[in-house]
């Protein structure tokens, strides 16, 4: 019994003399928050609707507020614009259709998630003053602080692809611009119906 007692005391003194090593701070594998970077297009889309999900397709309307120039080669006369403004309450309208994406960049501590809304703006302009030909426009959507997206809804990849065809077909069938019956809003409603 004496030997076992001495052996226990010896082990206890060794344990006290050599404490358990504390983890090295540099080896600590704790959870860290990953940095997120939002593009201006994603920020504009999330501002219009907070429930957006990665890899999903969405559509929005984009209105040019009163006093903001349409640009993009539009040749509407001042009288036509004034009449349209009174009828619609805004300068111009288009439809933005696209997909929310998330990509990861960097390594280790520099790892970031980049969120984007890759989309196309579909709208119709008046190509010339006389006779007033319509023109289909489909540039990549770029966020603009003077224009706000308005929530439309969720759509599918197939319907998002059909938006371009619907816009082209509309302009092919409606060649001459008219404030009543063939304006930017009539065009926009046709594109919206294609993506609903």
Predicted segment positions?
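A positional/structural detector of protein chain ends, strongest at the extreme C-terminus
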Residues: 1-3, 195-196
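N-terminal accessory segments that precede or flank the first globular/catalytic domain
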Residues: 2-7, 11-126
């Amino acid at each position: 019994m004496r030997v076992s007692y001495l052996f226990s005391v010896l082990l206890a003194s060794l344990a006290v003399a050599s404490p358990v090593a504390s983890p090295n701070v540099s080896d600590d594998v704790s959870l860290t928050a990953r940095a997120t970077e939002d593009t201006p297009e994603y920020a504009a889309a999330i501002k219009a609707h907070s429930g957006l999900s990665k890899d999903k397709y969405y559509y929005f309307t984009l209105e040019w507020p009163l006093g903001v120039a349409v640009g993009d080669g539009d040749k509407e006369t001042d009288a036509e614009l004034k009449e349209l403004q009174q009828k619609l309450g805004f300068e111009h309208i288009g439809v933005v259709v696209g997909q929310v994406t998330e990509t990861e960049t960097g390594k280790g501590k520099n790892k970031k998630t980049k969120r984007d809304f890759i989309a196309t703006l579909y709208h119709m302009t008046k190509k010339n003053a006389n006779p007033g030909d319509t023109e289909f426009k489909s540039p990549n959507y770029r966020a603009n602080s003077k224009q706000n997206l308005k929530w439309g809804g969720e759509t599918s990849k197939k319907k998002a692809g059909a938006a371009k065809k619907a816009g082209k077909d509309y302009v092919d069938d409606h060649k001459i611009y008219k404030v009543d019956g063939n304006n930017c809003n009539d065009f926009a409603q046709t594109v919206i119906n294609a993506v609903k």
